[in-house]
Amino acid sequence: METDNLLETVEPYVTQLQEEGWCVLENVIPADVVDEVRDEVETSEVDYNEFSKAHGRWERNVISFMPRFAAHLANERLLATIQQLLGPQVRISQTEYKIRPPHYELVRAYHSDFPYDLNQKWHIPQPFPSAVIGITTLWMLSEFTTENGGTWIVPKTHVDLRNPRGKEDGIGDRNPLDGEMQAIGGAGSVLIMDSRIWHSNAENPSAGKRTAVVVRYAPWWLNLELFGVNTATIPGETFDQLPDGVKMLYEHRAENREPTVWI
Protein backbone atom coordinates (compact mmCIF):
# COMPACT_ATOMS: atom_id res chain seq x y z
CA MET A 1 0.00 0.00 0.00
CA GLU A 2 1.31 3.47 -0.87
CA THR A 3 2.48 5.51 2.11
CA ASP A 4 -0.18 8.23 1.82
CA ASN A 5 -2.98 5.69 1.53
CA LEU A 6 -1.56 3.65 4.40
CA LEU A 7 -1.40 6.64 6.73
CA GLU A 8 -4.94 7.60 5.78
CA THR A 9 -6.08 4.05 6.53
CA VAL A 10 -4.55 3.96 10.01
CA GLU A 11 -5.41 7.55 10.99
CA PRO A 12 -8.60 6.61 12.92
CA TYR A 13 -6.66 4.04 14.94
CA VAL A 14 -3.85 6.48 15.70
CA THR A 15 -6.38 9.09 16.80
CA GLN A 16 -8.12 6.62 19.10
CA LEU A 17 -4.78 5.60 20.60
CA GLN A 18 -3.88 9.21 21.25
CA GLU A 19 -7.25 10.08 22.78
CA GLU A 20 -8.35 6.82 24.42
CA GLY A 21 -5.07 4.95 24.88
CA TRP A 22 -6.19 1.87 22.96
CA CYS A 23 -7.70 0.54 19.74
CA VAL A 24 -8.39 -2.80 18.05
CA LEU A 25 -6.98 -3.37 14.57
CA GLU A 26 -9.04 -6.01 12.79
CA ASN A 27 -7.89 -8.83 10.49
CA VAL A 28 -4.16 -8.36 11.01
CA ILE A 29 -3.82 -12.13 10.64
CA PRO A 30 -6.05 -13.16 7.72
CA ALA A 31 -9.01 -15.42 8.40
CA ASP A 32 -7.68 -18.15 6.11
CA VAL A 33 -4.49 -18.64 8.16
CA VAL A 34 -5.42 -17.64 11.72
CA ASP A 35 -6.45 -21.18 12.68
CA GLU A 36 -3.06 -22.64 11.77
CA VAL A 37 -1.29 -19.77 13.55
CA ARG A 38 -3.35 -20.41 16.68
CA ASP A 39 -2.56 -24.13 16.50
CA GLU A 40 1.14 -23.36 16.22
CA VAL A 41 1.05 -21.04 19.23
CA GLU A 42 -0.87 -23.50 21.41
CA THR A 43 1.41 -26.40 20.46
CA SER A 44 4.63 -24.42 20.73
CA GLU A 45 3.87 -23.24 24.27
CA VAL A 46 4.30 -26.85 25.38
CA ASP A 47 7.60 -27.08 23.46
CA TYR A 48 8.80 -23.79 24.93
CA ASN A 49 7.98 -24.85 28.48
CA GLU A 50 9.77 -28.18 28.02
CA PHE A 51 12.83 -26.46 26.55
CA SER A 52 12.86 -23.87 29.33
CA LYS A 53 12.58 -26.54 32.00
CA ALA A 54 15.62 -28.31 30.56
CA HIS A 55 17.76 -25.28 29.68
CA GLY A 56 16.39 -22.29 31.62
CA ARG A 57 13.80 -19.65 30.73
CA TRP A 58 16.45 -17.13 29.69
CA GLU A 59 18.06 -19.39 27.11
CA ARG A 60 15.70 -19.13 24.12
CA ASN A 61 13.42 -16.31 22.98
CA VAL A 62 9.76 -17.25 22.78
CA ILE A 63 9.47 -16.14 19.15
CA SER A 64 11.89 -18.90 18.14
CA PHE A 65 9.11 -21.43 18.68
CA MET A 66 6.38 -19.86 16.51
CA PRO A 67 7.63 -18.76 13.06
CA ARG A 68 4.16 -18.71 11.47
CA PHE A 69 3.00 -16.23 14.07
CA ALA A 70 6.23 -14.22 13.81
CA ALA A 71 5.65 -13.61 10.11
CA HIS A 72 2.78 -11.22 10.93
CA LEU A 73 4.58 -8.97 13.43
CA ALA A 74 5.65 -6.46 10.77
CA ASN A 75 2.17 -6.14 9.29
CA GLU A 76 2.15 -2.80 7.47
CA ARG A 77 -1.07 -1.45 9.03
CA LEU A 78 0.09 -2.44 12.49
CA LEU A 79 3.59 -0.99 12.14
CA ALA A 80 2.30 2.20 10.54
CA THR A 81 -0.01 2.71 13.51
CA ILE A 82 2.73 2.04 16.05
CA GLN A 83 5.31 4.18 14.24
CA GLN A 84 3.00 7.19 14.38
CA LEU A 85 3.42 7.07 18.16
CA LEU A 86 6.94 5.68 18.68
CA GLY A 87 8.74 7.00 15.61
CA PRO A 88 9.97 5.24 12.47
CA GLN A 89 12.50 2.91 14.13
CA VAL A 90 10.97 0.42 16.54
CA ARG A 91 11.89 -2.98 17.92
CA ILE A 92 10.22 -5.64 20.03
CA SER A 93 10.96 -5.62 23.74
CA GLN A 94 8.92 -8.63 24.87
CA THR A 95 7.01 -11.61 23.49
CA GLU A 96 4.85 -13.72 25.79
CA TYR A 97 2.28 -16.50 25.53
CA LYS A 98 -1.10 -15.53 26.99
CA ILE A 99 -3.23 -18.68 26.83
CA ARG A 100 -6.03 -19.22 29.32
CA PRO A 101 -7.83 -22.57 29.74
CA PRO A 102 -11.60 -22.95 30.10
CA HIS A 103 -13.15 -21.93 33.42
CA TYR A 104 -10.01 -20.00 34.39
CA GLU A 105 -10.51 -17.92 37.53
CA LEU A 106 -8.68 -14.65 38.06
CA VAL A 107 -9.15 -11.43 40.01
CA ARG A 108 -8.31 -8.04 38.49
CA ALA A 109 -4.64 -7.05 38.48
CA TYR A 110 -4.64 -3.55 37.02
CA HIS A 111 -1.26 -2.19 35.97
CA SER A 112 0.65 -0.35 33.28
CA ASP A 113 3.29 -2.16 31.22
CA PHE A 114 7.05 -1.72 30.86
CA PRO A 115 8.56 0.77 31.30
CA TYR A 116 5.73 2.04 33.53
CA ASP A 117 5.05 -1.09 35.62
CA LEU A 118 5.62 0.08 39.19
CA ASN A 119 6.15 -3.50 40.40
CA GLN A 120 9.28 -3.81 38.24
CA LYS A 121 12.52 -2.46 39.64
CA TRP A 122 13.43 -0.92 36.27
CA HIS A 123 10.29 1.20 35.92
CA ILE A 124 10.13 4.91 35.14
CA PRO A 125 9.20 6.74 38.36
CA GLN A 126 5.98 8.66 38.78
CA PRO A 127 4.81 11.06 37.54
CA PHE A 128 5.14 9.42 34.12
CA PRO A 129 6.25 11.71 31.28
CA SER A 130 3.64 12.82 28.78
CA ALA A 131 5.25 10.76 26.03
CA VAL A 132 4.59 7.35 24.50
CA ILE A 133 7.55 5.13 25.40
CA GLY A 134 5.97 1.73 24.87
CA ILE A 135 3.20 0.05 22.91
CA THR A 136 1.61 -3.20 24.09
CA THR A 137 -0.15 -5.41 21.57
CA LEU A 138 -2.37 -8.39 22.36
CA TRP A 139 -2.79 -10.70 19.39
CA MET A 140 -6.22 -12.32 19.59
CA LEU A 141 -5.80 -15.76 18.05
CA SER A 142 -9.21 -16.87 19.23
CA GLU A 143 -12.24 -14.62 19.43
CA PHE A 144 -12.20 -12.32 22.48
CA THR A 145 -15.64 -11.62 23.93
CA THR A 146 -17.17 -10.48 27.19
CA GLU A 147 -18.13 -14.13 27.71
CA ASN A 148 -14.59 -15.55 27.54
CA GLY A 149 -12.77 -12.67 29.16
CA GLY A 150 -11.67 -9.85 26.89
CA THR A 151 -8.85 -7.78 28.41
CA TRP A 152 -10.01 -5.17 30.94
CA ILE A 153 -8.99 -1.60 30.10
CA VAL A 154 -9.83 1.82 31.51
CA PRO A 155 -9.90 4.26 28.56
CA LYS A 156 -8.00 7.56 28.82
CA THR A 157 -5.95 6.47 31.84
CA HIS A 158 -2.80 6.63 29.71
CA VAL A 159 -2.70 10.35 30.58
CA ASP A 160 -3.65 9.95 34.25
CA LEU A 161 -0.73 10.81 36.55
CA ARG A 162 -1.95 8.27 39.08
CA ASN A 163 -1.58 4.50 38.79
CA PRO A 164 -3.32 1.45 40.30
CA ARG A 165 0.05 0.30 41.64
CA GLY A 166 1.02 3.73 42.93
CA LYS A 167 1.41 3.36 46.69
CA GLU A 168 0.21 6.89 47.39
CA ASP A 169 -2.57 6.98 44.80
CA GLY A 170 -5.24 5.10 46.74
CA ILE A 171 -6.66 3.28 43.71
CA GLY A 172 -5.76 -0.36 44.22
CA ASP A 173 -5.10 -2.87 41.47
CA ARG A 174 -7.36 -5.77 42.51
CA ASN A 175 -10.78 -4.17 42.27
CA PRO A 176 -13.12 -3.24 39.40
CA LEU A 177 -12.54 0.39 38.42
CA ASP A 178 -14.92 3.11 37.27
CA GLY A 179 -15.05 3.31 33.49
CA GLU A 180 -13.55 -0.11 32.88
CA MET A 181 -14.51 -2.08 29.78
CA GLN A 182 -13.47 -5.24 28.01
CA ALA A 183 -11.63 -5.09 24.68
CA ILE A 184 -13.13 -7.58 22.25
CA GLY A 185 -12.31 -8.67 18.73
CA GLY A 186 -12.39 -11.51 16.26
CA ALA A 187 -9.61 -14.04 15.82
CA GLY A 188 -6.77 -12.33 13.96
CA SER A 189 -7.42 -8.91 15.51
CA VAL A 190 -4.84 -7.03 17.58
CA LEU A 191 -5.50 -4.91 20.65
CA ILE A 192 -3.02 -2.01 20.60
CA MET A 193 -2.44 -0.08 23.82
CA ASP A 194 -0.33 2.82 24.97
CA SER A 195 1.62 0.92 27.63
CA ARG A 196 0.62 3.50 30.24
CA ILE A 197 -3.09 2.60 30.08
CA TRP A 198 -4.50 0.77 33.09
CA HIS A 199 -5.38 -2.76 32.03
CA SER A 200 -5.81 -6.24 33.45
CA ASN A 201 -5.95 -9.81 32.25
CA ALA A 202 -9.39 -11.35 32.67
CA GLU A 203 -10.79 -14.66 33.81
CA ASN A 204 -12.14 -17.11 31.25
CA PRO A 205 -15.48 -18.44 32.48
CA SER A 206 -16.28 -20.01 29.10
CA ALA A 207 -15.97 -23.65 28.05
CA GLY A 208 -13.31 -22.89 25.43
CA LYS A 209 -9.61 -22.00 25.50
CA ARG A 210 -8.69 -18.33 24.99
CA THR A 211 -5.45 -17.92 23.06
CA ALA A 212 -3.35 -14.80 22.57
CA VAL A 213 0.24 -13.60 22.40
CA VAL A 214 1.47 -10.37 23.98
CA VAL A 215 4.07 -8.44 21.98
CA ARG A 216 5.50 -5.15 23.20
CA TYR A 217 7.10 -2.61 20.87
CA ALA A 218 9.61 0.03 21.95
CA PRO A 219 11.35 3.02 20.37
CA TRP A 220 14.87 2.33 19.15
CA TRP A 221 16.53 4.31 21.95
CA LEU A 222 14.89 2.60 24.95
CA ASN A 223 17.26 0.43 26.98
CA LEU A 224 16.07 -3.19 26.71
CA GLU A 225 19.17 -4.85 28.15
CA LEU A 226 17.56 -5.63 31.47
CA PHE A 227 17.93 -8.76 33.55
CA GLY A 228 15.47 -11.52 32.75
CA VAL A 229 13.65 -13.65 30.23
CA ASN A 230 13.09 -10.78 27.79
CA THR A 231 16.80 -10.77 26.93
CA ALA A 232 16.64 -14.39 25.72
CA THR A 233 18.14 -14.85 22.26
CA ILE A 234 17.05 -16.30 18.92
CA PRO A 235 19.31 -18.92 17.29
CA GLY A 236 20.96 -17.47 14.19
CA GLU A 237 19.57 -20.12 11.86
CA THR A 238 16.04 -19.45 13.16
CA PHE A 239 16.51 -15.70 12.83
CA ASP A 240 17.64 -16.14 9.21
CA GLN A 241 14.24 -17.63 8.31
CA LEU A 242 12.25 -14.62 9.54
CA PRO A 243 10.88 -12.13 7.00
CA ASP A 244 13.13 -9.10 6.57
CA GLY A 245 10.66 -6.75 8.26
CA VAL A 246 10.46 -9.00 11.30
CA LYS A 247 14.26 -9.34 11.44
CA MET A 248 14.43 -5.59 11.98
CA LEU A 249 12.25 -5.97 15.07
CA TYR A 250 14.30 -8.77 16.64
CA GLU A 251 17.83 -8.13 15.36
CA HIS A 252 19.00 -7.16 18.85
CA ARG A 253 18.21 -10.72 20.01
CA ALA A 254 19.84 -12.71 17.17
CA GLU A 255 22.68 -15.06 18.12
CA ASN A 256 25.94 -14.86 16.15
CA ARG A 257 24.66 -12.37 13.62
CA GLU A 258 26.26 -9.02 12.90
CA PRO A 259 23.79 -6.18 13.48
CA THR A 260 22.81 -4.08 10.50
CA VAL A 261 20.62 -1.54 12.32
CA TRP A 262 20.94 -1.84 16.11
CA ILE A 263 24.69 -1.25 16.45
What positions do the PLM features span?
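Residues that flank catalytic or metal-binding motifs in active/ligand-binding sites
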Residues: 65, 93, 106, 133, ...
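Feature marks short, surface-exposed loop/turn motifs that line or immediately flank catalytic pockets
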Residues: 101, 145, 160, 219-221, ...
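A structural signal for short, well-ordered beta-strand segments
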Residues: 95-97, 137-139, 213-217
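Non-heme Fe(II)/2-oxoglutarate
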Residues: 2-3, 190, 197-198, 202-263
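Double-stranded beta-helix
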Residues: 131-134, 143-202
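Short, surface-exposed loop/helix-turn segments at secondary-structure junctions
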Residues: 111-122, 166-179, 209, 228-233
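A short secondary-structure junction signal
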Residues: 105-112, 119-122, 147-153, 162-166, ...
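Non-heme Fe(II)-dependent double-stranded beta-helix
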Residues: 1-128
